[in-house]
Amino acid sequence: MKIRSSVKKICNKCYLIRRKNNLLVVCINNKHKQRQG
């Protein structure tokens, strides 16, 4: 999980989720996991 100020989709399989006012990027590839912080 990378914590970034701006989260972007890295590949086509990535998708954005809003969970408890946090933006998350979730993907099949675990290296693409990101959270806005």
UniProtKB/Swiss-Prot annotation:
Its main location: plastid. GO terms for molecular function: structural constituent of ribosome. The keyword Ribonucleoprotein applies. GO terms for biological process: translation. InterPro entries: Ribosomal_bL36, Ribosomal_bL36_sp. The keyword Plastid applies. It comes from the Eukaryota. Keywords: Chloroplast, Plastid, Ribonucleoprotein, Ribosomal protein. One of its GO terms (cellular component) is ribosome. Pfam families: Ribosomal_L36. It is found in: Plastid, Chloroplast. NCBIfam families: rpmJ_bact. Belongs to the bacterial ribosomal protein bL36 family. This is Large ribosomal subunit protein bL36c. The lineage of its organism: Eukaryota, Discoba, Euglenozoa, Euglenida, Spirocuta.
